[in-house]
Each structure stands twice: as structure tokens, then as C-alpha cells.
Curated annotation (Swiss-Prot):
This is Probable malate:quinone oxidoreductase. Pathway: Carbohydrate metabolism; tricarboxylic acid cycle; oxaloacetate from (S)-malate (quinone route): step 1/1. InterPro entries: FAD/NAD-bd_sf, MQO. HAMAP family: MQO. One of its GO terms (biological process) is tricarboxylic acid cycle. One of its GO terms (molecular function) is 2-hydroxyglutarate dehydrogenase activity. Pfam families: Mqo. It catalyses: (S)-malate + a quinone = a quinol + oxaloacetate. Keywords: FAD, Flavoprotein, Oxidoreductase, Tricarboxylic acid cycle. The keyword Iron-sulfur does not apply.
Length: 553
């Protein structure tokens, strides 16, 4: 009996020792210089920059799903537009005197040129390969109808001619000419309808998911880079030396937790970035809240449709709709196949990610951001009405919207696709309590040890300049050093300069990136004469007709 008891005791001690060793291993700390949270294009872009700027730095990327680029960066979850303001009318708002402001359009275009240079450099460095797998020439068009909208497009076209970045843009109000540019848009249209269009040949369709996969695949070839999939962030702890200990769970291994100690943490988790930023406890996070809006598209893969449309055609947002909600009918090249998408139609879910939780919105609401959210809701009732009307749309109503851009569309050629979630930024404001912010914001602590990217637009197309801005903010001294300056100018030749206003530099950059990326580019030859716009000063808006706040879909 004593022998049996002794044996059982020995086994118990042994099992306990094994258990303790397993727990010790589970809580063992992994160390890394840079921790990238989220396997999307932002983390992949930042990681690629840092790998070239500081090749000795160790990096770890964690992603909750079982592969990278499966959320917002996925080609099917976004519109795939290389946003350069060539056709997006919301980037050129009308001023009080009736003229058109182009400042935002110039900024957006400059930013996209940085992305083009970044991608071209990665192709030349062997990081990206087969450019046609991720970027293709697809002309960008604006198309409008009705006297007021035609007059606006005239004014927009005239104003954009003042910028060197928009040289080569064509303009027409002729049905036959526009039909040559976009047959589907014009066939079956009333020949008496007053229409106008602009067209820029150098527009692009971009598969941001493919770019992300290729960037991460290249990073994985480096011995000091680690990718951990099926890994969810569970907590943050700031250490005395200003580093961070981040607790993560292995979702494929019984949610076993382990810790990663990092000198710098980037939260590039799309819609989940806000909640993770809040969990860090940094005071800067208290200024922000988020409101999720989803998007749906009608998709056609019918060759009769696909082969007769090669353009991205953006219209004008209807009265009472946010400017960014502008409908568009787009050629997309996804996984080597051409398709046509029309939309977006706004949807609502409390999830912050397509693969998120229905509790996301509630769990991100805190005592510090609740009132700003209430203030935004009360101050933007027209936006709330718009979202409700979108959610209530029937299939027939969506199809009628499509027929405004494709009069001879057949219902059987189209199916509805749910794209990704876009979390809009709500920021605390001293005067209004809270404001809805269109765009992206880099939020970091004062020491530059942790940073998050919030917001949704223009998003992926400006990943390269956004991550440049982030590095200028958190690695200020490094960016100012001669070593980093030289490398950054190798990656982005125009870094530190403006292309706008310099015809020679603009043409040189477009020619270089087009050659490397396999894109179409012909130097501009002629300027179309457009009828002179009638500038109509805006009547002082009444409170009931306040402009609808903008959101990204």
C-alpha cells in the first residue's frame, strides 16, 4: 500500500512539474523590436519600409484570421480604386462663390504618386512581382447629368487644369464621344438628356490584397521577421523602460496565451484599431469613438457586360447623401479575372470588422466618448436618415439605381456582394462636443512607442504616404538622419518635394512608375475646350438644408 501511495505521489509531483513547465512556457516572453498588429496593407507597408530602413530590427506581425489580407485589404471588400481625385467629385467641393476648390484633390493625387513610387521601388527590389497581378490601367471617369451637375463638372474641369497633376484629362458633353469612352453608360440613354464626362487614361484599378500578400511573403524571407496567424491580442502593459508587453492568444491552440515584448507597437487592425487603442490606456485614445458603416456592391461577371466596360465611372452624390457615397460602376481585375461592380450601398452592423463581433460598437463606447457620439448623432440627423433609407433599400430599388448608370442593365446579370466594414472616426471637439472626421488619423502616445491608424478614407491607396507620416511622427530623429533621408529618397524619389507645379518632375515620375508597373502613360498633348461654367454663388444655406456630413463606404 505504501508503495502504491509513494508511486501516486511521485506521479502527482511529476505531472505538476510538467504542468508548471508548460505554464512557464506559455507565459514565456517573446521579444521583438517592432510588433505589427493586423495583417493588412498598412502593417505590411510599414514593415516593408522598416525592413529597408533598419534591416537589423526584428519584427513580429500578428493576425487574428488564418491568413493576411482577409479583411478590409481583401480585393472583394473594397472598391479597388487607386484614389487620385481624377474622378471623385467629393474631393473638389463647390466654394461659396460658385467656383471649385481643388486643394484636397491635389493632396490626394500627390499622395497616390507616393504610393506608385513605393510600389515601383518594391518591384525593382524584387519584393513585389508581376505588377499586373495587383495594378492595372483602368481609365477614371466622372459622369453627370442635369444642368447644375454639368455646370459643376465644367467648373471642376476648368479648375483642375491649373494643376500639373491633372494634365491629360479629357472633357466632353457629346453623347457619341462619351459612348466611345463608356458604352454601357450611354446605350439606351435619352439622347436629349444633358450629360457631361471627364476621362483620364492613367487611372488605375488596384488589388490591395495581392499587394499585401506579396509584401508579407517577402518579409517572411527575412530571418528576423515572424508572422503569427490565428493570434488575437488580449491585453497591453506598459513597462518601466517604455516598451510594451502585449498578451496574445493562439486561437488554434486552445487560446493559449503568451506575451510579446516590443519596443514599438503599431496597431494597423482596420476597424479593430480603435478598441485595441483604447485597451492600451494611453490618454490620447480618449478623444476618439467609432461608428461602423458597411458597404454592398452589385457584381456582374457576364462577359457581355464585362467586355463592354473598361472604366471606373463615378457620378455625383444625390441630394441628402454624403458626398463620399457617390455611386460608381467599375471595372475590377480580381485574381486575374475582370468583373464589373456597382455601388456602394450603405449597410449597418454593430461589427467593426466583417469578421468582428456584434458587441464591437457597445464595447468601444466609454464614459469619455459617449457624449461626442451623441452629439454627432444629434448634429447629423440627415446622415442618420440617409443610412436608414439605405438599409431599407429593396433589390428593385438597388437595381433602379444601377440603371441610372447602365440603362440597359438586366437583373439576372447581377448579384449582391457584402463588402467590408468602415469605422468612421468621431473625435471630441471643444465647440461641438464631437465631430465626424473623414479620412485617416495616426494616433500615438507622446513618446512614440505605440501608434494606431484610425479611419477609412482614402485608405489603402495612400498606405505608403500614411506610413511615411507615421514614421515622421514616431521615429522623428531617425527620419531626420542622413541615412534614413537617403534611403527614403531611394524608395520614394519625390520624397520631400511637391510634384504639383512642376511639369517636368510630374511627367518624369508618371513615366518611371508606368514603365515599372506596366501602366499606360502618354504625355498630354491637347486640352479639350469646355463651355465656360456659370459661377453661381451659393445662397446662404438654411439650417434645415445643412450639408450632410461625409462618410467612407
Amino acid at each position: 500500500m505504501k508503495k502504491v501511495t509513494a508511486m501516486l505521489f511521485t506521479m502527482a509531483v511529476g505531472l505538476n512539474a510538467v504542468s508548471m513547465a508548460a505554464k512557464a512556457k506559455a507565459t514565456e516572453e517573446q521579444e521583438t523590436d517592432v510588433l505589427l498588429i493586423g495583417g493588412g496593407i498598412m502593417s505590411a507597408t510599414l514593415g516593408t519600409y522598416l525592413q529597408e530602413l533598419e534591416p537589423e530590427w526584428s519584427m513580429t506581425m500578428v493576425e487574428r484570421l488564418d491568413g493576411v489580407a482577409q479583411e478590409s485589404s481583401n480585393g472583394w471588400n473594397n472598391a479597388g480604386t487607386g484614389h487620385s481625385a481624377l474622378m471623385e467629385l467629393n474631393y473638389t467641393p463647390k466654394k461659396a462663390d460658385g467656383s471649385v476648390s481643388i486643394e484636397k484633390a491635389v493632396d490626394i493625387n500627390e499622395a497616390f504618386q507616393v504610393s506608385r513610387q513605393f510600389w515601383a521601388h518594391q518591384v525593382q527590389s524584387g519584393v513585389l512581382h508581376e505588377p499586373h497581378s495587383f495594378i492595372n490601367t483602368v481609365p477614371h471617369m466622372s459622369f453627370v447629368w442635369g444642368d447644375d451637375n454639368v455646370n459643376f463638372l465644367r467648373a471642376r474641369y476648368t479648375a483642375l487644369q491649373q494643376s500639373t497633376l491633372f494634365r491629360g484629362m479629357r472633357y466632353s458633353e457629346d453623347h457619341a464621344q462619351i459612348k466611345e469612352w463608356a458604352p454601357l453608360v450611354m446605350e439606351g440613354r435619352d439622347p436629349k438628356q444633358k450629360v457631361a464626362a471627364t476621362r483620364t487614361e492613367i487611372g488605375t484599378d488596384v488589388n490591395y490584397g495581392e499587394i499585401t500578400r506579396q509584401l508579407v511573403a517577402s518579409l517572411q524571407k527575412k530571418p528576423n521577421f515572424a508572422l503569427q496567424l490565428n493570434t488575437e491580442v488580449r491585453g497591453f502593459k506598459r513597462n518601466a523602460d517604455n516598451s510594451w508587453t502585449v498578451t496574445v492568444a493562439d486561437l488554434k491552440n486552445g487560446e493559449a496565451e503568451h506575451a510579446i515584448k516590443a519596443k514599438f507597437v503599431f496597431i494597423g487592425a482596420g476597424g479593430a484599431a480603435l478598441k485595441l487603442l483604447q485597451e492600451t490606456g494611453i490618454p490620447e485614445a480618449k478623444d476618439y469613438a467609432g461608428f461602423p458603416v458597411g458597404g454592398q456592391f452589385l457584381v456582374s461577371e457576364n462577359p457581355d457586360v464585362v467586355n463592354n466596360h473598361l472604366a471606373k465611372v463615378y457620378g455625383q452624390a444625390s441630394v441628402g447623401a454624403p458626398p463620399m457615397s457617390v455611386p460608381h460602376i467599375d471595372t475590377r481585375i480580381l485574381d486575374g479575372k475582370r468583373v464589373v461592380l456597382f455601388g456602394p450601398f450603405a449597410t449597418f452592423s454593430t461589427k467593426f470588422l466583417k469578421n468582428g463581433s456584434l458587441w464591437d460598437l457597445l464595447s468601444s463606447t466609454t464614459t469619455s466618448n459617449f457624449m461626442p457620439m451623441v452629439n454627432v448623432g444629434m448634429d447629423n440627423f440627415d446622415l442618420v436618415k440617409y443610412l436608414i433609407s439605405q438599409v431599407m433599400l429593396s433589390d428593385d430599388e438597388r437595381f433602379e439605381a444601377l440603371k441610372e448608370y447602365y440603362p440597359q442593365a438586366k437583373k439576372e446579370d447581377w448579384r449582391l456582394w457584402q463588402a467590408g466594414q468602415r469605422v468612421q472616426i468621431i473625435k471630441r471637439d471643444e465647440d461641438k462636443g464631437g465631430v465626424l472626421r473623414l479620412g485617416t488619423e495616426v494616433v500615438s502616445d507622446k513618446d512614440g512607442t505605440i501608434a494606431a491608424l484610425l479611419g477609412a478614407s482614402p485608405g489603402a491607396s495612400t498606405a505608403a504616404p500614411i506610413m511615411l507620416h507615421l514614421m515622421e511622427k514616431v521615429f522623428k530623429e531617425k527620419v531626420a538622419s542622413p541615412e534614413w533621408q537617403a534611403k527614403l529618397k531611394t524608395i520614394v524619389p519625390s520624397y520631400g518635394t511637391k510634384l504639383n507645379g512642376n511639369i517636368e518632375a510630374t511627367e518624369q515620375e508618371l513615366q518611371y512608375t508606368s514603365d515599372v508597373l506596366g501602366l499606360k502613360y502618354d504625355k498630354p498633348q491637347v486640352v479639350d475646350e469646355a463651355p465656360k461654367p456659370q459661377l453661381k454663388p451659393q445662397v446662404q444655406p438654411q439650417p434645415a438644408h445643412k450639408a450632410v456630413a461625409d462618410i467612407a463606404l
